[in-house]
Amino acid sequence: MKTSLQKSTRFINCTISGIPKANAILCKEGSIKIIGLSSEIVGDKTIDLRGGVVYPGFTDSHLHLLGIGISLETLSLTNITSPEKIIEKIVKKLKSINEGQWFKGWGWDQNNWRDTGYPTKEMLDAVSPKSPIYLKRIDGHATWVNSRALTIANITKKTQDPDGGKILRDNYGAPTGILIDSAMELVRQFIPKYSKADKKRMVLKAVSQLNSLGITFVHDAGTDLETIEILKNLISEKQLNICIYAMLTNNHKVYDNYLKSGPFFDNKGYLTVRTIKLFLDGALGSRGAALLHPYYDNPENMGLILLDIQKTIDKVKKFNSAGFQVSIHCIGDRANRIGLNILETAGERKLRNRIEHAQIIHPNDIKRFADIGVIPSMQAIHCTSDMHWINKRLGADRLNEVCNWQSLIKTGTIIAGGSDAPVESPDPLSGVYAAVTRKDKAGEPAGGWQGHERLTREQALLMYTQWPAYASFLENKTGKIKLGFQANFTVLSKNLMSVLPEDILKTKVLFTIVNGKVVYAE
């Protein structure tokens, strides 16, 4: 007997992950209505999935949506192997701007250079004495500026470091041109803001890129009011092709009204606003991550704590009582310990509070995540990017604290997986590969870096599907191919459970489907 639904879409010619006897899915109004055999299902519209393997739509649990869009329109300095080559690239691009206009770039990483020391303002002054230059580091926690930018911001020898930030200085106390964490704002406040139209264009570019990678859902780590308004407008215009779980930025102008009104839910599942993002420390690459012991390569430095602890405790209580989850950025082991202390003191377990990154965790704190009910949101690709230089930052004795995925899972917690894009590539297949191998794309090191912490393929898939759904309170709506669930699918050319590890990277995205609509086809 054949089953049909009006105004429905039938997806056929596929293998469905976890449902071996089915080869078709019928969807209507954005949800899954029937899973079965194509010979028994009739739809108003039929889409041939070309023999692909259908997975629950992949979710990235931590990225920066507008940041991705900005990166697509800004000079990229990623994977450049020396400051001299960066200067060459800047010189070519400077020809396209007017003298005195702000020049921006992003993505430099001194860890990729032979001399891994920080660059200086003089390098930029030599090619641009009159146009201010602002170059954001790959992690977004440091910036490299020239003297003109420092002059505009009135940063001199006498300028004190702001709370939660650092102005790097030479032996005479003069700023070198490197600003860490909150010190970046001293210059950034003078850069012209993007218009709403600019932001809309950038968001759409970001969504298009994410769709092409098989991503159907994202957790946006730091969303301001204007971006939320843009997203709502895109929903009403039926232009938003991705589902978004928005983390409010830590600014009272952004969150005050939400504290009064409570969380926001779009009834189509495109937008949820029910968490706030806090930054407790900086990043490891720029030595702002807060450590329990000094940096191995900078013994005077233990990193930065960016928040007042008591005020943060009060804020967690306030947000949890209003029904909002709290997501705290913690990279270093000191930050993770303090973050856990804060959430243990002030958090409500039912709010599923999160720690974003959880990259370096003291062994004594591993079990606390499960005990307190805090969800670690981690990015597998950070492990394989950082492993080549992290020994310089931490020394050999602390490497057992880094990216302890399997140790965390064994205590009973889940891990929400993501990329931190544009810091890393948003490609979830690169993330799955990193999670199951702990190797770089060249296949090094043999056995994987700290290979005992590798994930199984099943765990890696959960990290991009069911676990993010739970981390966003949506485990009964998305993250599975199940009747009544949101019709979000990622269709791949290969079966991730059976291909060789290196072939995960060769797997193609054939289709991306959001709310039953094909938003990307190869």
Regions found by a protein language model. Give the residues of each.
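Non-cysteine beta-strand/loop elements that form the S-adenosyl-L-methionine
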Residues: 64, 270-288, 372-384
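An anion/phosphate-binding loop that grips the pyrophosphate of nucleotide cofactors and donors
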Residues: 61, 372, 487
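Divalent metal-binding segments
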Residues: 4-28, 32-259, 278, 283-335, ...
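Short, conserved secondary-structure segments in the cores of folded domains
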Residues: 7, 23, 477-480, 509
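Acidic (Asp/Glu)-rich catalytic clusters
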Residues: 234-238, 262-268, 348, 369-373
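A generic structural signal for residues embedded in beta-strands
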Residues: 34-35, 105, 489-492, 521
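P-loop/Walker A phosphate-binding loop and immediately adjacent motor/lid segment at beta-alpha junctions
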Residues: 93, 501-522
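His/Asp/Glu-enriched, well-ordered alpha-helical/loop segment
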Residues: 317-327, 331-353, 357-358, 363-367, ...
